[in-house]
Structures are given as C-alpha cells and as structure tokens.
Amino acid sequence: MRFIKKYPLLNIVNSFLIDYPAPPNISYLWNFGALAAFCLGIQIVTGIFLAMFYVPSIESAFSSVQYIMRDVNYGWLIRYIHANGASFFFICVYIHVFRGLYYNSYITPRELLWNLGVTILIVMILTAFLGYVLPWGQMSFWAATVITSLFSAIPVVGEYIVIWLWGGFSVDNATLNRFFSLHYLLPFVIALLSLIHVAVLHESGSSNPLNIALSVANKVPFHPYFIFKDLLGIIFFLIVFCYAVFFKPDSIIDPINNVPANPLVTPTHIVPEWYFLPFYAILRSIPNKLGGVITLGLALIVLFLLPFITNNVFKGSFFEISKTILFWSFFSVCVLLGWIGFKPIEDPYLMLGQMLTVLYFFYFFSLAVIVPTLQAYTFKNVFAK
C-alpha cells in the first residue's frame, strides 16, 4: 500500500478501488454499476476490432458485415459479443436506474450524480441507435429514415435540420459515414462521463438500502469486501452472457435486418431494438408528430427534474408502502410500454399506449405532489400524536 500511495496516479486508483469507504449494508443491486462499466469495456474493445473491417458505404456496409461474419477469424464471435453486449449493457443500466428510483438515490446530496447518470443513459440511447443503422439491413435503413424524419416536426427549421442530419435530401452515403463516425466516438464520451460519474459518487458517497447518512467510521473499505463481491457478480454475468452469445446469438436481431436495405420496399412493421421500445411506444402514442416528439422529450427530461420536484420526509421507499406500490406500478408500466412498442400501431394497442403514457407521467406527478401530501398528513396525524 505504501508503494501505491507513493505515486499520484496509483494513489487515485487506490482511493477509488481500495480505500474508498462504502456502506456495509449494500446488496447485490449495487453491483450493476460495476457490471455496466464492464459491459462498456467489452463494447469499446469489440467495437474497435469491428471498425477495422467495417466499410461505411451504402454499397459495401452490408457486405462488410457479412465478410466479418464469414471470413474474418472469429469475426462472428466479435460481432455477436458486440451485438448482445449492447443488450446486456442496457439491462445493467436499466436495473441500475430502477434501483436508484426505488431507493431514492437521486435526493440530496446526489442530484448531480443522478443527472450525470441520466445524461449517460441518453448518450447510450443515441449511440445504440447509430450502431443499429450501421449493418445497413432493411430495418436499419428504415429506422434511420423514420427517426431522423422526426426532426421535421420542429416548426420552421425542422426540414433544414433533417437535410443537415442526412447530409443530403435522403438517407445516403453521407448519413452512414457520419453515423459511423459518431458511433465510434460516443462510447469514449460515455467512458469519460462514467469517470466523472464515479468521481462525483466518491464525493457524495454511495447510497444504501436504508438511505441514511453513515460516517466513515461506520463504513468498510472497498477492498477486499466489495471488490470480491463485484467479481462474483461479473462471474455470474459472464455465465449468462456466454450462454446468450454461443447458444442464442440471434435472439435479439430482427430477421428482416439480414436483408440488404431497399429504399423502395417499406417493412410492414418497423420495430426498434427492445431497449428502445418503451420510449418508442411513448413517441407513437401521440397521433400528432410534433406532440409525439415533445412527449418523448418530456419522458427523458422528467428524469433530470426528479431530484428537484420531490420533497421526501422519509428518505427511502423501504419505509413507505405507498412509494413501494408506486414504484412497482411504474415498473409494470415501463414493461407494458415495451410490449406495446413491439405491437403494430392499431387498436387496442394504440389506446393502451396512450393510457400507459399517462400513467408513466403520473408516477412523477405522484412523487412531486401526492406522496409529499401523504407524508405531511402522516406526520401531522400519526407521528405528532
């Protein structure tokens, strides 16, 4: 330890991974931050290798992906790790976010920490969308066309923004090139934001299931207790991940995307990847294009506002049955929105999507208005006596 503390860079590593004081009562739900970082590392490494053989051209993109799968040594493995790694990355991050919601990890003094996490999530969504376009299959092309066309809903300047995004008057070579460039760059932006996220975490301190402030004397060092706990989580993660890669590699890939992009043939039903589906359902639940875009934006912005619109007397859902019921209702709404996003735009799915969208926002309204009112009533009529 004396050797590590002698050098400034190693001393930073020591303060982050060895001597960092962590609450002794955190559960395995706190492992998913480390698992998300592990997934990000996998994505960056496999992405670099894939970029060596990928050709960002509408004539060659699809063929280059097939070349990677068939002729590059272990190219099939690298691609399947990258494709399935994206799904597992989102699984880890979504569990991380829902854990934060359940245990109120967004309240003082962790407002900045929470908002950095939401920023990382949004950059992840953008990066994943750009990557989904790169294979240049049928679904990739039409996903790029539909999603970028949403900017045309912006009054006055919308059409100009779409042309600027495309680099022309249609989705073409310029579009694919800039999508590839950004998809290669943004994972490093996510890595930088993650480092800042961890630095802020070490400044504000980790939360815990009881969400109570603990002194340093009541905490334990990160090593060896949580290092080995995280390693155990990574081992279990790798078992499930390897099963998906080696036995179910195509389970998340839309079969239509194995067909080269054809601008003259529109798929009967455009479905994005599963991790976009809840937001996709919110987007299309509003019949008006501009209204749908605004609603989608609000669905993400409200996550930023969460630390500032809630006023909690009790610090964690652990102590409040009302917030526990609200949380699991919200979780169910998100799962159902994902299911609705997978379905065609027709009744009854359209009506259900609109109802679930209202319930999505009702959760945040409840945290801002209804829960504080119940807390004030409880304090006044129960604890005051």
Curated annotation (Swiss-Prot):
Could you say which cofactors this protein requires? heme b
Amino acids binding heme b b562: 82, 183
**Major place of residence:** mitochondrion
**Binding residues for heme b b566:** 96, 197
GO terms, biological process: mitochondrial electron transport, ubiquinol to cytochrome c
Cofactor: how bound: Binds 2 heme b groups non-covalently.
GO molecular-function terms, A-Z = metal ion binding; ubiquinol-cytochrome-c reductase activity
KW Glycoprotein (keyword) present: no
Pfam families noted in UniProt: Cytochrom_B_C, Cytochrome_B
Q: Name one GO cellular component term.
A: mitochondrial inner membrane
UniProt membrane topology term: Multi-pass membrane protein
The protein's UniProt keywords, in alphabetical order, are: Electron transport, Heme, Iron, Membrane, Metal-binding, Mitochondrion, Mitochondrion inner membrane, Respiratory chain, Transmembrane, Transmembrane helix, Transport, Ubiquinone
Q: So where does this one cross the membrane? A: 32-52, 76-98, 113-133, 179-199, 226-246, 290-310, 322-342, 349-369
Localization, per the record, is: Mitochondrion inner membrane
Task: Report the InterPro entries cross-referenced here.
Answer: Cyt_b/b6_C (IPR005798), Cyt_b/b6_C_sf (IPR036150), Cyt_b/b6_N (IPR005797), Cytb/b6-like_sf (IPR027387), Cytochrome_b (IPR030689), Cytochrome_b_C_euk/bac (IPR048260), Cytochrome_b_N_euk/bac (IPR048259), Di-haem_cyt_TM (IPR016174)
* Binding locations of a ubiquinone: 202
Subunit note: The main subunits of complex b-c1 are: cytochrome b, cytochrome c1 and the Rieske protein.
Q: Which PANTHER family match?
A: CYTOCHROME B
> What does this protein do, in the record's words?
Component of the ubiquinol-cytochrome c reductase complex (complex III or cytochrome b-c1 complex) that is part of the mitochondrial respiratory chain. The b-c1 complex mediates electron transfer from ubiquinol to cytochrome c. Contributes to the generation of a proton gradient across the mitochondrial membrane that is then used for ATP synthesis.
Additional remarks: Heme 1 (or BL or b562) is low-potential and absorbs at about 562 nm, and heme 2 (or BH or b566) is high-potential and absorbs at about 566 nm.
Family designation: Belongs to the cytochrome b family.
The molecule here is called Cytochrome b
